[in-house]
């Protein structure tokens, strides 16, 4: 068994996806030093990439307005490389919406593209910068209309 990364400071990692062409890995990473207000949950996770022993955040997170373009306002999970390995799709839950009302924190799908880095001017101790520009590609609504294309929860890819 080869260990490519070991989490520290009480963080958890999981759901590893391997790059289709090189020895590169992307996976879910939970928060370091979790506490009663910030713990391993959908809207507190991030994507992390490991390549040649170098570790970097895939996505940036900015939960303080004004928000940074290309950064997420919550957690990414279930990361999957595109067939050519250039982009990464992921599922997403929004911390800001969860704080307003958990019923508004609807799962979406996003794409991380290699147009970074995305540098966050950290105004909250849990904010961080990332290597990729992220954008959501799904649209959800809390109350989808029957017979419409509206959804209240998006899934992988």
Spell out what each predicted region is.
Residues 1-157:
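Sequence signature of WD/YWTD-type beta-propeller architectures
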């Amino acid at each position: 068994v080869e260990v490519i990364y070991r989490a520290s400071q009480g963080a958890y990692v999981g759901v590893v996806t391997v790059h289709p062409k090189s020895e590169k890995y992307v996976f879910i990473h939970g928060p370091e030093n979790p506490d009663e207000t910030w713990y391993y949950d959908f809207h507190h996770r991030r994507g992390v990439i490991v390549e040649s022993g170098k570790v970097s955040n895939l996505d940036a997170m900015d939960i303080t307005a004004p928000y940074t373009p290309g950064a997420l306002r919550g957690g990414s999970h279930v990361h999957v490389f595109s067939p050519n390995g250039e982009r990464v799709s992921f599922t997403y839950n929004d911390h800001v919406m969860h704080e307003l009302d958990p019923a508004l924190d609807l799962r979406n799908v996003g794409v991380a593209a290699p147009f970074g880095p995305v540098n966050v001017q950290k105004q909250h101790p849990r904010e961080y910068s990332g290597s990729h520009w992220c954008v959501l590609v799904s649209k959800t609504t809390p109350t989808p209309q029957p017979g419409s294309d509206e959804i209240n929860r998006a899934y992988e890819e």
